[in-house]
Amino acid sequence: RFDYNSISTFSSVLSANIQDYFDSMGLQTSYNACSYYGHTPLTASLFSIKYEYSTGEPSLPNNVSLLNSASYNLESGGNSTVYAYEYNNTLPLGFLINSSSIAKMNSEAGDPFTMQNNFVTSAVNGGQMIFHRLKTDGTNSITAQYNLEENDTANKSGTKVYDIYFYCETLTATISNGSIQDKSFVSSSVTTSTSKTFDSANQNYICHLGNVPEGATISISASDNTAISAMYAYAFDETAWEYDYNLLNANPYQVTSFSDTKIEGTLTTDKGNLLYTSIPYDKGWSVYVDGQKANTTAICKGALTGVMVTAGTHQITFKYTPRGFFQGIIISIISLLILLGLIFRDRILELITGKKKGSKVPSKKPQVQKAVANEEPKVSK
């Protein structure tokens, strides 16, 4: 409809593996759809999201830049403005990660923040945790103060503002002793609010609250006043993310051309490893490294496509052919021949037998030739 590529998908044949992976990373899904709701700077980057448009503030104000804006007329009268934002850190379609991280990506982590931390710390050597746990009562209250896990060695003393994300069923979040402070791209000033509501949260996705001052208390409540059974709250670490992004982007797969069924590009690496791609895994994909067919690997809970590559500079081509495509062509041709045979059955039988069914062969009639007298009769004188 809008003629652009998007991460959001509605399909009756949506892969169950895609749904499972989206769920584990905190993105919104249903039985026949997956959505951009629940994205973080990491998941937006992993799926190569470059742009976002909105009629107001962007979803991740700390991680985008205003690219352009345009006014338009509303059907109901008046006018509005649409803003185009560009993400600051977008990973390419493919990049190298440690092959040993496959096990981590396929494991269950308990909550999406731990899952995302596991990705960055295992995908690259020296990767840092990008989410740090906050104090909560486990159900409906968050305090803007760190409660670091045992394996989180980050020194976060002196933090004055927390970029807070949380995950639970829900939701309206209300701030006490502080306010949500988002970077405003429209008026270049700080905007504040004390509450934020999230739609369709019964499908469980990560909610981004925004920048909250240290010590503030956030109360979480469900719109239908139902009890919240569990809640996870973390602060995003922009410094760690910048560091991890540079590590992940060190060996990018650079696309040189693409179409609906073919992607071509190059990759340079000084050691063999796993090429991670955000291409949904499907047996219809074939990959060729320097012209030689290579094996694809299902990664990220079987949702995405990976390829093992050796050290060096490689030309890597992905080709897609729907499963059963050639068998379908053969069956279609055979079916067409059978149909034509039924339609022209009588004529085919005529050609085979050399005569029409039930007709008689006409007999040859002798030709009677009439003599014509060309000579005039003789007259006696």
Give the label of every model feature segment.
Residues 30-74:
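Periplasmic/luminal catalytic loop of GT-C fold multi-pass membrane glycosyltransferases
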Residues 1-47, 91, 97-101, 108-115, ...:
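Extracytoplasmic/lumenal acceptor-recognition loop(s) of multi-pass membrane glycoenzymes
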Residues 6, 53-56, 89:
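Short, flexible loop/turn elements at secondary-structure junctions
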